[in-house]
Amino acid sequence: MSNPTYVQEYNAIVDVLSQYNEGGAKADSTLMKPAFNEQATLFGVDGDKLVGGAIQNLYDVIDNSFRPSPEARAAIVRIDIVGTAASARVDTDNVSGFRFTDFFNLLKVDGQWTIVSKIYH
């Protein structure tokens, strides 16, 4: 079998999303960095204003404003895969006292799934 199956691709994406979840729960961006492409972006809305930009903004918040949250729980609600593109929704409770819904876009680059964008609520 030379081509990966859907289940293999799905599980590879779950592994990437798990790196993100672990970094958030442990308040350590070094644990989540491997999940993201170096050119990745993140965006959200604060009040009525668009906020975000380079993924470094996320790392800074994780390292400076979050605290380890062993009580954090995350659920991968959905993963859609088409060829080398995928999207995912992850709902997280109790990360530094917050509840998040994250939407990720991933691409398979050089045989590895990587997050290229994140939007959040």
Regions found by a protein language model. Give the residues of each.
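Short, low-complexity N-terminal intrinsically disordered segments enriched in polar/charged residues
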Residues: M1-E22, K26, T30, P34-E38
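Surface-exposed, charged secondary-structure patches
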Residues: E9-A12, T41-R99
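Intrinsic disorder/low-complexity detector
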Residues: T30, V82, F104-L107
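Short beta-strand segments enriched in hydrophobic/aromatic residues
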Residues: F36, T92-N94, I119-Y120
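Short beta-strand edge/turn micro-motifs at domain boundaries
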Residues: R99-H121
